[in-house]
Amino acid sequence: MTTLFVCITCKARDDSPTKEEPRPGLRLFAALSRSAAALGGEIAVVPVQCLANCTRACTVAVSGAGKWSYVVGALDPDRDAPDVIAFARLHHADAAGLPPWRERPEHVRRNTVARVPPLPSSLSPQSETGAR
């Protein structure tokens, strides 16, 4: 399973959401949740308080057990949910979580903030230091 962690506190730099209008991050979470629900459990969507990418909000993290993880920013909640879902599906389909770069949606290619390796299945003192 691939998990989308969505920052629900994200807001645009010039944005001052009112009580009547939810923050853009919360709107993105709602859009992604609706889209993922139609996929039958392939993708889980989880709200988080902050992904520390405030200058490039809205932000999501895409991860899966034993797979590479990605942080993607500069997402528009009204436009980019389909691209995030498409990327999450590619991530889900690849055993290592490394979808081919050219197959990723353009917005994801241009706005990937970080790619994080999976945790080793067992850490030894050697593997923690990188020594051989």
Regions found by a protein language model. Give the residues of each.
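Functionally engaged cysteine thiol sites
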Residues: 7-10, 50, 58
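Polybasic, low-complexity association/targeting segments
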Residues: 1-14, 124-132
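Short Fe-S-cluster ligation motifs
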Residues: 40-50, 76-108
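Immediate flanking context of iron-sulfur cluster ligation sites
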Residues: 1-5, 29, 33-53
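Short flanking/linker segments adjacent to small metal-binding domains or redox-active Cys/His motifs
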Residues: 55-56, 61-67, 88-132
